[in-house]
Curated annotation (Swiss-Prot):
Residues 1-23 form the signal peptide. Disulfide bonds join C257-C304. Substrate binds at Y82, N127, A128, E129, N187, Y251, Y353. GO terms for molecular function: beta-galactosidase activity. Pfam families: BetaGal_ABD2, BetaGal_dom2, BetaGal_dom3, Glyco_hydro_35. This is Probable beta-galactosidase C. It comes from Aspergillus oryzae (strain ATCC 42149 / RIB 40) (Yellow koji mold). Keywords: Carbohydrate metabolism, Disulfide bond, Glycoprotein, Glycosidase, Hydrolase, Polysaccharide degradation, Secreted, Signal. GO terms for cellular component: extracellular region. Cleaves beta-linked terminal galactosyl residues from gangliosides, glycoproteins, and glycosaminoglycans.
Amino acid sequence: MRLLSFIYLVWLALLTGTPQVSATDNGKTSDVAWDKYSLSVKGERLFVFSGEFHYQRLPVPELWLDVFQKLRANGFNTISVYFFWSYHSASEDVFDFTTGAHDIQRLFDYAKQAGLYVIARAGPYCNAETSAGGFALWAANGQMGSERTSDEAYYKKWKPWILEVGKIIAANQITNGGPVILNQHENELQETTYDSNDTKVIYMEQVAKAFEEAGVVVPSSHNEKGMRTVSWSTDYKNVGGAVNVYGLDSYPGSLSCANPNSGFNLLRTYYQWFQNYSYTQPEYLAEFEGGWFQPWGGSFYDSCASELSPEFADVYYKNNIGSRVTLHNIYMTFGGTNWGHSAAPVVYTSYDYGSPLRETREIRDKLKQTKLLGLFTRVSKDLLKTYMEGNGTSYTSDDSIYTWALRNPDSDAGFYVVAHNTSSSREVTTFSLNITTSAGAMTIPDIELDGRQSKIIVTDYSIGSESSLLYSSAEVLTYATLDVDVLVFYLNAGQKGAFVFKDAPADLKYQTYGNSNLSALETSQGTQYSYTQGEGVTAVKFSNGVLVYLLDKETAWNFFAPPTVSSPTVAPNEHILVFGPYLVRGASIKHDTVEIVGDNSNSTSIEIYTGDEHVKKVSWNGNLIDTRATAYGSLIGTVPGAEDIEISLPSLSSWKAQDTLPEISPDYDDSRWTICNKTTSVNSVAPLSLPVLYSGDYGYHTGTKIYRGRFDGQNATGANVTVQNGVAAGWAAWLNGAYVGGFSGDPDKVASWEVLKFNHSSLRSRDNVLTIITDYTGHDQNSQKPIGTQNPRGIMGATLIGGGNFTLWRIQGNAGGEKNIDPVRGPMNEGGLYGERMGWHLPGYQVPESALDSSPLEGVSGAEGRFYTTSFQLDLEEDLDVPIGLQLSAPAGTEAVVQIFMNGYQFGHYLPHIGPQSLFPFPPGVIKNRGQNSLAISMWALTDAGARLEQVELKAYAKYRSGFDFNRDWTYLQPGWKDRTEYA
């Protein structure tokens, strides 16, 4: 029987020109299956159009739904999500999945509500430019042994995490009515030894078993770290540890913020890669470039035009389609914020990433362009089963054009993806394309590519129950099967388009409404309709009932096809068409009214096509708007914006200041601090001196650390001090209250070795106190030598010069250490500055009368520190979304460490001498858009030149009238001050 089946498959392959592969499942569930073409969910093929989202980087659960609605509206049907162990586990065997933004059940619920599937990525290791790559920081002090191997010490640490988070993932699988369709094992773990006894192979088997023990049954996946190794594919040297669906990570842009002409070189070898190494599986780009992170001292995202360009999305993402990719995840789609101390040293506070959705949750043109592809893939079911018919420069009349040619073996639908062969080219090229259709071979003339532009030319393409295109040189945005078949095309304004209906009558009549005039030409293959794309919306009504919309690209950016169902899969008869607004979050039809929920910055016209003759009215965010009916069946009106609203943000005044470095004084009482008395470390990196001064050995992992070392005698002339707290992290030292040196931080140095020079007059015969305060930019990721995430933090070594030894060291860090005394904000929010330990940054803190009337604009005159607090009131209108940030600047040459706390959340780490970030946004929920807000700024000078700011100002990024409810009681996310004197 197997032989007969094999013969049949060979015969079928010869007949269709492509191998046939039956759908496969993992033996645990058939709800999610796959073959060489695509993933299938509940028996239906799915183009996975996914966006990467990290809930930890947006600590307001209600706003997760805001982001999800924006992704859904812009063509996405899936989100890919990291779950950071570090965020949920402040100490060993303690997990928080319920408090505030730690409640990941809400994540799954909101994803389902928005109509998005979920790809779960819980590690244990995640990387993601987050501190320690997502490992729990209590475990990253060296006690994990050889991380990301089968080392027993490591295994005992990570397994409880996977079991705990795995149970929640399992409960939210599609098999249980939830949105999870794939579960990733580990992250970019490179398989270098193909041996079943290899430690990495054993480790991957352990991870698989742990997820299985937790109840996860959906297919497993992994993400290859670029085309450097071949890892964990069942189709290549499978000795164990392989996953069900192999994925590849790729960031090919090589773009430069400083030079917009550099990079932009397409990689055209994805198809070959997948054919070599995962040929029985669908092509899955588990992470594809949606932007790129920026380091300390680098560029700020808003100024990086090359990363923000919609051209990248147009050319690169369509190239992936041409490569037969059918699982496509964009990393990042929304980046968010590295608030608190959650960043790895390679990034600063903002994790905007240059992503399609800005850190402020605003829609960039890049997302609008991405939407055009998302909506196309949503309805193009024939794209989900194609073979590579060919590729190269021979398909066109101009060899400067490269073409991918895909063919569906069942329907013969064709997809020709064209772009400049030199993808960085800015030339305008007009050419003819040779195509194959059911009516034979033919040539489409007058196709134009304007520099960095790509197009998908379709043939034998179904656009409804009774209509098809023989071909079109205009790009299909979407189509709908409503009362009639409705087709939406787009082109750049001024470009020519042509299309032919398949098997349509030759004498079709049509009426045009708009700026693009259509002409008809009889050909042997049918009537060709040609036009030059004008600006705005043009509608063409054909006598066979088909309605065609012709849009210029910028108009298409503000086109939406809101589904009328909640499922991530949307059939052509399950959405309506809306033109004009900034955002359409959703739409529904009730009786004679179409109810639309959306956002608008400026008043715009709106056009709605529902295909329902009973619909006569339009409601926008609950309010009826005046409309008129068009001759072709749509309704047109105007929806309001926010341009008439004046946003007046309060000036920041009435500052109070207190000393946040009282520990500088030799008389400071540190008797309750942790004594550094260890002579051996759990860390394999040997300390440079004893006792061990690694902060992690004493339970302090995040933020500022303060050390006080004591010694006797007046012989010491200085000290050798080595500090390692991440790139760009500085530190300063005081002897008996006098500044003696330090290091201002360097974005190129992971550690610093400094010689402190003592003034003899500052020395005492007994009980000298050397106070060292260190900044912190995060724990390293796995790739940083020598031991990755477990590289020690704090003082690596400290010895006296000139005679004598330290007699006692004490350390202080974040209040409570691993106790997680503020579970809502979580274990990475605070550091060890005195003001933080005392809770001066928290709402409700009452400033004592002894506090100074002083602002950050006055600053400090020497090597000192201040903690500044003030409050302000906001009273924005209830239907407004106004992203707000804090703009800082400092005089040139200022070397200081500045932190911003909004209602208790550390939402800004500002190093004016390193940069680049100086504007720090706060999402609603961290800031109250209606109510009293508490703002605190900590600042300490890294040198005796002092420090001050010259600008501290609230800034509004933009304003939108919104159908989303931002007018909420955020109190539960902003717990207030409680007495903390025990942590002094």
